[in-house]
């Protein structure tokens, strides 16, 4: 299988031609047309077909490829159906190499060895896995080698020489060179990175005779020949998907065949057919700056089997750079002096309140409340935001982007950006913008821009997708200030470090007030920022129970919940190996919670390890139970908690009832609930009767 790819490049070289590498998403616009399109690509002169494995959360792809994915997934395309399509294409006379291209989680879910064996059986020649870097792909590459199937690495303009050497060493057929930073997309303005010759020259220094295929931004025949002058192959994907989207039903195969013939025509100066026209000529740009290589990763990337850096190559170097700056800050007392100098601004230390009436109501253990809701901005999020803003300063970045669900992280980020004079853009799902309109307005009052995300479920998960894409495109000037302990290394460790102030203060305050450690600490769990912030300082204290309260939504016996640790299975999502709510085919499951901040299908890797090792317990709290906790704290303690925190209040109440009266538990009140009053009002007519709460007037 690998040999056929090599022969394709060798034949093209002998004929003094470039290999046209084309891309089409499997099942787009439907399976029958996919096969005809593959025939059309071959008939038009394509030398290799990349057959896309559709994925619900394609963080490296632009809107065109994502639209193809969306249509394919609506057609119920799974990895098994991709294999069936390859077999049908081979039976229909497609003889050129077929490379399966996509994201790792569907493959991980199916099984590495099983995937590779099946691919070989049906006639696929290799794999390009966007978010599986060679460090994470050791076992996968070994199995590919054993089966004679190719594993194609990707390099980007940001790839350092040191890393380039590693990537070149694992290439067994060709190297995919990403011509520019950013997500996938044809070059609608006719712009091709003129630093491409230097990039290809740098790759060849390590690749030797291994062929290079260059992609991202190729649109016209002029592009094809210009890119081909410095490469062995030219990759075209988004433009093909765009043509298929615009084609009349049943004509896509003919359209792409004509387009391939146009791309590879010998005279690129000939007039461009109207249907293939783009907006201009090749632009000039300075060579891409290459960051000096980092010798090593300073900190462990994983918590047991969880964690890692499952990211597109374009993100790798900036994560390495971020880790280096963080590691130096971690061991620099001046950094921590500066961090602590903002404690008065943040409202730290936060209070540890004894909940006397709530304790009496539950009739069991003493209940204490860690009042992160009293922080500046109304939540625990300020801890992480101040810390990461200081890192961004050290990185020399002048712009901040972030995702937000309930808006608490968006508000905290906007606060810090204003305080430090940085531009700020917040990505927020359109549905979350609706149900958290007050926080949207707060963010704008603070001078930040809010970008509503209309893709997918229009919630936190989709906001993370868009923030990651934006970061790749603006990486030189922008820091992605992630709000939870999720994502690729080093983000989970960074967020945990800055949020650990919650647990550290709790430990000291309990010693002062009770001369002992708490018997249990309780926190809500979405991505995991407040929970790991509370839990981490107590990990080694085996006498302290740790209880995480997830969003049970309508109940875990329904599909409408966000209880990742209760109901999820191990997968790879948003750059990290962790527990994920996913379907059997590895596609990410839609989620639901009354609380926008917990409405997320993944979770931080350290929390996954705490579950896997049974160090912490996790329960699912339904929307109705959440409102019970919300009501109890309002009525008994005069505190309106965030709906996120209300999950922990309910879980803490139930735990307190089971424990003796000489025990102490601490519940993290991660945020205040004024942002949620409208949501509660909307939900009470539905959920109120279930808990006997009627506030209608």
UniProtKB/Swiss-Prot annotation:
E.C. no: 4.2.1.20
Ranges for region Tryptophan synthase alpha chain: 1-298
GO terms of biological process kind: L-tryptophan biosynthetic process
Top enzyme category: lyase
Cofactor: pyridoxal 5'-phosphate
Pathway: Amino-acid biosynthesis; L-tryptophan biosynthesis; L-tryptophan from chorismate: step 5/5
Modified residues (N6-(pyridoxal phosphate)lysine): 381
CDD domains: Trp-synth_B, Tryptophan_synthase_alpha
Catalytic activity from the UniProt record: (1S,2R)-1-C-(indol-3-yl)glycerol 3-phosphate + L-serine = D-glyceraldehyde 3-phosphate + L-tryptophan + H2O
Assigned GO CC terms: cytoplasm; cytosol; nucleus
Domain of life: Eukaryota
Pfam families per record: PALP, Trp_syntA
Region Tryptophan synthase beta chain: start-end pairs: 298-697
GO MF annotation list: tryptophan synthase activity
Active-site annotation: 50, 61
Keywords: Amino-acid biosynthesis, Aromatic amino acid biosynthesis, Lyase, Pyridoxal phosphate, Tryptophan biosynthesis
PROSITE patterns in the record: TRP_SYNTHASE_ALPHA, TRP_SYNTHASE_BETA
Family, per entry: In the N-terminal section; belongs to the TrpA family.
Cross-referenced HAMAP family: Trp_synth_alpha, Trp_synth_beta
UniProt protein name: Tryptophan synthase
Lineage: Eukaryota, Fungi, Dikarya, Ascomycota, Taphrinomycotina
């Amino acid at each position: 299988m690998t040999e056929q790819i090599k022969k394709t490049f060798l034949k093209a070289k002998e004929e003094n031609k470039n290999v046209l590498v084309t891309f089409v998403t499997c099942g787009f616009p439907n399976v029958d047309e996919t096969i005809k399109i593959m025939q059309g690509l071959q008939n038009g002169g394509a030398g290799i077909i990349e057959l896309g494995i559709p994925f619900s959360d394609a963080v490296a792809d632009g809107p065109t490829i994502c639209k193809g994915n969306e249509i394919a997934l609506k057609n119920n395309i799974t990895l098994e159906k991709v294999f069936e399509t390859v077999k049908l294409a081979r039976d229909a006379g497609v003889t050129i190499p077929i490379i399966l291209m996509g994201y790792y989680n569907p493959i991980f879910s199916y099984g590495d060895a099983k995937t590779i064996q099946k691919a070989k059986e049906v006639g696929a020649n290799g794999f390009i896995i966007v978010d599986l870097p060679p460090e994470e792909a050791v076992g996968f590459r070994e199995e590919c080698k054993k089966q004679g199937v190719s594993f194609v690495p990707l390099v980007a303009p940001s790839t350092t020489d040191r890393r380039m050497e590693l990537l070149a060493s694992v290439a067994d057929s060709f190297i995919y060179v990403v011509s520019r930073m950013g997500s996938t997309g044809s070059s609608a303005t006719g712009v091709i990175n003129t630093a491409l010759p230097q990039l290809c020259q740098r790759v060849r220094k390590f690749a030797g005779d291994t062929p290079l295929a260059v992609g991202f931004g190729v649109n016209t025949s002029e592009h094809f020949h210009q890119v081909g002058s410095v490469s062995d192959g030219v990759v075209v994907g988004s433009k093909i998907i765009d043509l298929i989207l615009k084609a009349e039903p049943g004509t896509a195969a003919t359209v792409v065949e004509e387009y391939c013939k146009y791309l590879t025509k010998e005279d690129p100066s000939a007039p461009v057919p109207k249907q293939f026209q783009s907006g201009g000529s090749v632009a000039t740009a300075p060579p891409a700056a290459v960051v000096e290589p980092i010798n090593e990763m300073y900190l462990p990337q994983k918590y047991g089997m969880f964690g890692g850096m499952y990211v597109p190559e374009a993100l790798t170097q900036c994560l390495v750079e971020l880790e280096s700056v963080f590691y130096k800050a971690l061991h620099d007392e001046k950094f921590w002096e500066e961090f602590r100098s903002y404690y008065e601004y943040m409202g730290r230390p936060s209070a540890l309140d004894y909940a006397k009436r709530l304790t009496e109501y539950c009739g069991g253990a003493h209940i204490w409340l860690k009042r992160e809701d009293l922080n500046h901005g109304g939540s625990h999020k300020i801890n992480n935001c101040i810390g990461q803003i200081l890192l961004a300063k050290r990185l020399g970045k002048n712009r901040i982007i972030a995702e937000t669900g309930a808006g608490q992280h968006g508000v905290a980020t906007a606060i810090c950006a204003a305080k430090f004079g940085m531009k700020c853009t917040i990505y927020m799902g359109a549905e979350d913008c609706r149900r958290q309109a007050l926080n949207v307005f707060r963010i704008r009052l603070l001078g930040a821009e809010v970008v509503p995300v209309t893709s997918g479920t229009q919630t936190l998960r989709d906001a993370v997708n868009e923030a990651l894409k934006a970061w790749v495109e603006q990486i030189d000037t922008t820091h992605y200030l992630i709000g939870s302990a999720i994502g690729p290394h080093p983000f989970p460790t960074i967020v945990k470090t800055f949020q650990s102030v919650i647990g550290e203060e709790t430990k000291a305050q309990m010693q002062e007030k009770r001369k002992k450690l708490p018997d249990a600490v309780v926190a809500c769990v979405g991505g995991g920022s407040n929970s790991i912030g509370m839990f981490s300082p107590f990990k080694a204290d085996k006498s302290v129970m740790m209880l995480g309260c997830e969003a049970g939504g309508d109940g875990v016996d329904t599909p409408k919940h966000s209880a990742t640790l209760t109901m999820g299975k191990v997968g790879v999502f948003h750059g990290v190996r962790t527990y994920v709510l996913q379907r059997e085919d590895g596609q990410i499951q839609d989620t639901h919670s009354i609380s926008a901040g917990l409405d997320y299908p993944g979770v931080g890797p350290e929390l996954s390890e705490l579950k896997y090792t049974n160090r912490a317990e996790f329960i699912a709290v339904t929307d109705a139970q959440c409102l019970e906790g919300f009501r109890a704290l309002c009525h008994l303690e005069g505190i309106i908690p965030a709906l996120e925190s209300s999950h922990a209040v309910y879980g803490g109440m139930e735990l307190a009832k089971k424990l003796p009266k000489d025990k102490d538990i601490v519940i993290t009140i991660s945020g205040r609930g004024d942002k949620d009053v409208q949501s509660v009002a909307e939900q009470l007519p539905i959920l109120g009767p279930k808990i006997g709460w009627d506030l209608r007037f």
